[in-house]
Amino acid sequence: ESAPDLSGQTVTISGPWLQPEDEVFRSVVAYFADATGAEVIYTGSDSFEQQIVIDAEAGAAPNIAVFPQPGLAADMAARGLLYPLPDSMGPWTAENYGAGESWVDLGTYADKDGNDQLFGFFYNVNVKSLVWYVPENFEDAGYEVPGSMEDLRALTEQIVADGEVPWCIGLGSGAATGWPATDWVEDIMLRSYPPDVYDQWVTNEMPFNDPKVVAVLETFGKFAKNDKFVEGGSKAVGSIDFRDSPKGLFDIPPKCYMHRQ
């Protein structure tokens, strides 16, 4: 099927990707521009979460926005700041995405009238819940890969007892500083409670001051707020850019032994 002729038209896109991460996306955009004749303008920002709201409220939103967090898209959809996708996109997404209907559900939110509509589909999905380490460093120190949260805590304590630093953690991300901590907290929640508890938390049926949520936050704090557990001490966690945080794994000798993605 041939691409439509969009000569003379402009498509504006805003998203969180900056150089060099945006290079692959820009190559896809360039292919679309060549195929259709449209001019495509992409603007990246490390303050996307704030800027997209400001632009939408001012009536200056882009044609397309790349949301790192579906929750923000849901909030804006409920305020009437987003336009739903055509009805045909739901079946197309279910048919062409490996996870099928679940991807449709993740892009479906209530509009300002409370009606569920498809507002987005997933272009780029990041792998989470991985703990990175350098095998040679573990071998040299005599450490084994932990198989449970209890083993992970024990290994963390062992590394400290050996006079080393177990973790590199960085939460810095410009105006969005702090979001990597949400990955930790979400992961711990899913490892601590059944999926339905996580869903209640996401939909705000269970508030943030619920004892379960507080316990999960405190568990994360045991890693991030202990000066002996993190490279640079706990006060550095918020200022180290998340993109730079894994670098300590590769120093010789290593500045830390583990980094969570």
Where are the regions that the model predicts?
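Conserved N-terminal structural module of periplasmic/extracytoplasmic solute-binding proteins
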Residues: E1-L81, S88-Y97, A141, V145
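Hinge/lid segment of periplasmic solute-binding proteins
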Residues: S2-D5, P70-S129, P180
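Short helices/loops that flank or line small-molecule/ion binding pockets
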Residues: Q50-A61, R79, N137-F138, A154-D162, ...
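Paired acidic/hydrophobic, glycine-rich loop segments that form the ligand-binding mouth/hinge
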Residues: N63-V66, C168, Y257-Q261
